[in-house]
């Protein structure tokens, strides 16, 4: 298992190249300020990857203040299946909406469609998934932090967001494992 409540904060600058890649692939909106927290790296559910909480802020000139444009979960997985090329997977699992139709039809097997359907049922269209040269990049815009910890004198009530975040991470690992399902490596 892993401890989401006391997850490690990523070392300063360690995730910057990865965050830039998420922006280039179109998984998250571009912004001037990034804050990453609760970094987790390791194998889970049959896939090796990492997940972290990310907040993206963009400067809004007319209001003279930064505006939050993304606050959610980002994950990157190294797939065992040697997939070459790039494809964007839509949350509805429709292969005709993928950016590379041939690759999308090949990858959208029933287990992958089921994993995408679970994510869509929970988060609607706030999911962005891109496969690029054997790596799966997924972002879910939750528009909230992973943890809403109570204040100093507040009672710890309604802590349902902690298991909900754990479920989100588990569903992302399930998606990566589904993409690798049936792959023997030979």
At which residue positions do the language-model features occur?
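Charged, low-complexity intrinsically disordered regions
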Residues: 2-186
């Amino acid at each position: 298992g892993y401890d989401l409540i006391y997850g490690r904060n990523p070392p300063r600058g360690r995730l910057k190249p990865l965050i830039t890649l998420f922006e280039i692939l179109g998984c998250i909106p571009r912004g001037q300020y990034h804050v990453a927290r609760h970094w987790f790296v390791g194998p889970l559910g049959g896939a090796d990857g990492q997940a972290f909480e990310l907040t993206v802020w963009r400067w809004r000139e007319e209001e003279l203040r930064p505006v939050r444009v993304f606050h959610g979960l980002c994950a990157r997985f190294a797939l065992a299946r040697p997939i070459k090329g790039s494809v964007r997977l839509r949350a509805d699992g429709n292969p005709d909406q993928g950016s590379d139709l041939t690759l999308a039809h090949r990858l959208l097997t029933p287990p992958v469609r089921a994993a995408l359907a679970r994510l869509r049922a929970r988060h609607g269209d706030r999911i962005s998934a891109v496969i690029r040269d054997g790596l799966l990049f997924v972002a879910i815009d939750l528009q909230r932090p992973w943890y809403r910890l109570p204040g100093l004198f507040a009672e710890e009530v309604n802590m349902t967001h902690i298991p909900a975040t754990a479920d989100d991470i588990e569903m992302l690992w399930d998606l990566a494992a589904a993409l690798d399902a049936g792959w023997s490596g030979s």
